[in-house]
Swiss-Prot record:
Record cross-link Glycyl lysine isopeptide (Lys-Gly) (interchain with G-Cter in SUMO2), residues: 6, 21
Modified residue annotations for ADP-ribosyl glutamic acid: 3
Residues the record lists as PolyADP-ribosyl glutamic acid modifications: 36
Protein name (database record): Histone H2B type 2-E
Keywords carried by this UniProt record: Acetylation, ADP-ribosylation, Chromosome, DNA-binding, Glycoprotein, Hydroxylation, Isopeptide bond, Methylation, Nucleosome core, Nucleus, Phosphoprotein, Ubl conjugation
Function: Core component of nucleosome. Nucleosomes wrap and compact DNA into chromatin, limiting DNA accessibility to the cellular machineries which require DNA as a template. Histones thereby play a central role in transcription regulation, DNA repair, DNA replication and chromosomal stability. DNA accessibility is regulated via a complex set of post-translational modifications of histones, also called histone code, and nucleosome remodeling.
Gene name per UniProt: H2bc21
Organism: Mus musculus
Length: 126
């Protein structure tokens, strides 16, 4: 009696394995494109602030959108400032001014001090 060819069980609806196992016509596995996000950094900060607290994937998506939005706003404002001052380079000074313009009061002060601290740490590590 001939053996029947064993086939892999059909993936469940919505299964992520179905996407990873997708094959091209020549038999090679297709690489999944990487999605860049700030999720690992958001998670690290969360653990520094609240070590026993978790975050849902929906909340992480919202945080990722928030960081992307703020990044874009700061970059646009810094670009505008550089253009006004006839500069072709965005420096930490433009970023700092953009943060002061975009964020309200106390939040701007904290952001500027944390940013200054990060730049100092970066330059001293060189």
């Amino acid at each position: 009696m001939p053996e029947l060819a064993k086939s892999a069980p059909a993936p469940k609806k919505g299964s992520k394995k179905a996407v990873t196992k997708a094959q091209k016509k020549d038999g090679k596995k297709r690489k999944r494109s990487r999605k860049e996000s700030y999720s690992i950094y958001v998670y690290k900060v969360l653990k520094q602030v609240h070590p026993d607290t978790g975050i849902s994937s929906k909340a992480m998506g919202i945080m990722n959108s928030f960081v992307n939005d703020i990044f874009e706003r700061i970059a646009n404002e810094a670009s505008r400032l550089a253009h006004y001052n006839k500069r072709s380079t965005i420096t930490s000074r433009e970023i700092q001014t953009s943060v002061r313009l975009l964020l309200p009061g106390e939040l701007a002060k904290h952001a500027v001090s944390e940013g200054t601290k990060a730049v100092t740490k970066y330059t001293s590590a060189k």
